[in-house]
């Protein structure tokens, strides 16, 4: 199946767009720091703690665990898991910054401990931490998927294209996020928009998984490899 340029580049675009949406979500609140501080009462220290939450578990060894999962379970399982974690984490973060959540008893309870960190920030940090685990796992998975689909083909070029598409997400969100916040009247609009994009990214990877399953079937028939889980 990867002998077809259309098939392998379609596969690349599907997974690259997932990473594009992921990188958009990473920085969606970066240009909105002043707004979130104004609307939710976060201090610069609170914003810094929230932003660092993305990397906490990865620094503590989660990336190594992600590599083990990828080796044991394969590209499809790990990719769907990572895309799901990104979407779930993003949804939790979105809930944490909504106007509705600020009025809940749970948010009030979150504010009763570590009082310098508002309940909304704790909820957003939890979601961002889960998202970060999924995003870094996805990056490793995408690299392995490209190596598989472009073996003996334009592998280096494909990796460069994927990284370029993903990084454009950062440029886009720094431009789009303030506009959405202005149009929608708050920080939750841009975050909600990027959360929906992550759902589309998950769907993209599900489509890729169907293609990858078919590709594996062809490799098994050709005796090149045993079937991947």
Task: State where each predicted segment sits.
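Extracytoplasmic
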Residues: 10-44
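Central cavity-lining transmembrane alpha-helices of secondary-active solute carriers
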Residues: 52-68
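C-terminal ends and interior cores of transmembrane alpha-helices
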Residues: 84-117
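Cytoplasmic helix-loop-helix junction between adjacent transmembrane helices
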Residues: 121, 127-165
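Glycine-rich segments within core transmembrane alpha-helices of 12-TM secondary carriers
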Residues: 156-181
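Symmetry-related core transmembrane helices of the 12-TM Major Facilitator Superfamily/SLC fold
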Residues: 188-208
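Flexible cytoplasmic inter-helical loops of multi-pass small-molecule transporters
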Residues: 209-229
């Amino acid at each position: 199946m990867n002998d077809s340029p259309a098939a392998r580049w379609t596969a690349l675009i599907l997974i690259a767009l997932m990473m594009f949406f992921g990188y958009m979500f990473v920085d969606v609140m970066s240009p909105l720091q002043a707004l979130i501080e104004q609307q939710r009462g976060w201090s610069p220290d609170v914003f810094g703690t929230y932003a660092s939450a993305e990397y906490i578990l990865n620094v503590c060894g989660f990336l190594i665990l992600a590599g083990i999962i990828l080796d044991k379970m394969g590209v499809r399982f790990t990719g769907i898991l990572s895309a799901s974690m990104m979407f779930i984490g993003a949804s939790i973060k979105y809930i944490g910054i909504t106007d509705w959540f600020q009025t809940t008893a749970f948010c009030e309870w979150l504010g009763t401990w570590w009082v310098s960190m508002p309940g909304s920030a704790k909820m957003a940090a939890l979601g961002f931490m889960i998202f970060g685990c999924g995003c870094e796992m996805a990056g490793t998975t995408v690299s392995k998927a490209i190596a598989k689909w472009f073996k003996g083909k334009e592998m280096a070029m494909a990796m460069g294209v994927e990284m370029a598409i993903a990084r454009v997400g950062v440029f886009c969100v720094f431009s789009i996020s303030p506009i959405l916040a202005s149009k929608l009247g708050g920080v939750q609009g841009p975050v909600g928009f990027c959360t929906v994009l992550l759902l589309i990214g998950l769907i993209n990877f599900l489509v890729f998984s169907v293609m990858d399953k078919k590709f594996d079937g062809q490799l098994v028939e050709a005796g090149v490899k045993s079937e991947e889980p």
